[in-house]
């Protein structure tokens, strides 16, 4: 499948190609020098983040149609983030402001290999306070794909809002896309995280998990296919496991396989999984026959691997998101 190029942007703007992302958007503070602890870091670079918002921006940057639903503090950071969504051509009509809570912050420790550790300030932050009554369910029902993570499941009232939006999407025949995006420091305990993440597992049509998340959820070796397949259920259309720079594995009812990744100079892995998901959802929204056509799926996953790889070459998530041209260039150079 050819990913959306310049000629596909107009078609993507049609509402039947709309991907609505639900959840959190926050400010990541990334150290200006990798390999130091938060206490040792001399300075930090401010970067917009939050997995569902990263996905929305990734889709729009690739010429797709995306919207974001979530709540922000009525503060400078909150307004800055919503403006960033708009600047990235993301529909922000589902964005709300809370006068009594702050926008969430995260301090990110960068290891020498670009992997990360997080320290969050969100107790409670505005995104946690979104209520069911505040939802724009009309926007959700207009989507071709409804995408979400698990952080919005951690506490009320956001959990109830998440469940209501998901129910509305399913009732309207919208495809449900789930990337758990495990962040253990935000959950009361690892067991609570596992239980919460799996509580909505069987509602999804498409699930993307990392190899580390497979290991966490199954308490087993992510390289053992038996453990991966324990996450499969009847009704799931596609399960994708991302394996970092090694690429990804895919599983459908009728076929399974793997697609190799791309070698790049990794600086910061923040947002790589979101770039991967966003690029895949652009293609799913455009043509969901990729769930049944292995050749199309493999081509789409190759493009997604390229998008994820490119995102690791700069600090921060949204600023590092690829364009169609940069992804195609990486693919061409690797051939």
UniProtKB/Swiss-Prot annotation:
Inhibited at high fructose. Expressed in roots, at higher levels in stems, and hardly detectable in leaves. It holds the Pfam family PfkB. Coiled coil: none annotated. GO terms for biological process: carbohydrate phosphorylation; fructose metabolic process; starch biosynthetic process. Its EC number is 2.7.1.4. GO terms for cellular component: cytosol. GO terms for molecular function: ATP binding; fructokinase activity. Belongs to the carbohydrate kinase PfkB family. This is Fructokinase-2. It comes from Zea mays.
């Amino acid at each position: 499948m050819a990913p959306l190029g310049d000629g596909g942007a107009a078609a993507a703007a049609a509402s039947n190609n709309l991907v609505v992302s639900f959840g959190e958007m926050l400010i990541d503070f990334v150290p200006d020098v990798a390999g130091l602890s938060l206490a040792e870091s001399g300075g930090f670079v401010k970067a917009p983040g939050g997995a569902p918002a990263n996905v929305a921006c990734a889709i729009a940057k690739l010429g797709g149609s995306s919207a974001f639903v979530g709540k922000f503090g009525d503060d400078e950071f909150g307004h800055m983030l919503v403006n960033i969504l708009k600047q990235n051509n993301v529909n922000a009509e589902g964005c709300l402001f809370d006068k009594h809570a702050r926008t969430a912050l995260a301090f990110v420790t960068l290891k020498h290999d670009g992997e990360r550790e997080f320290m969050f300030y969100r107790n409670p932050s505005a995104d946690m306070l979104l209520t069911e009554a505040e939802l724009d369910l009309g926007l959700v029902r207009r989507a071709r794909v409804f995408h979400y993570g698990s952080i919005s499941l951690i506490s009320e009232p956001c959990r109830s809002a998440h469940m209501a939006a998901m129910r509305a999407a399913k009732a309207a025949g919208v495809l449900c896309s789930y990337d758990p995006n495990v962040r253990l420091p935000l959950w009361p305990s690892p067991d609570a995280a596992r239980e919460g993440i799996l509580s909505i597992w069987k509602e999804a049509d498409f699930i993307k998990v990392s190899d580390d998340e497979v290991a966490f959820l199954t308490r087993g070796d992510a390289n053992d296919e038996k453990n991966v397949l324990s996450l499969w259920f009847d009704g799931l259309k596609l399960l994708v496991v991302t394996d970092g720079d090694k690429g990804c594995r895919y599983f459908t009812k009728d076929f399974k396989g793997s697609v190799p990744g791309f070698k790049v100079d990794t600086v910061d892995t923040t947002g790589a999984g979101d770039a991967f998901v966003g690029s895949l959802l652009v293609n799913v929204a455009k043509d969901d026959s990729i769930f049944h056509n292995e050749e199309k799926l493999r081509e789409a996953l190759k493009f997604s691997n390229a998008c994820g790889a490119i995102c690791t070459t700069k600090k921060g998530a949204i600023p590092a998101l690829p364009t169609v041209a940069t992804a195609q260039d990486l693919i061409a150079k690797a051939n």
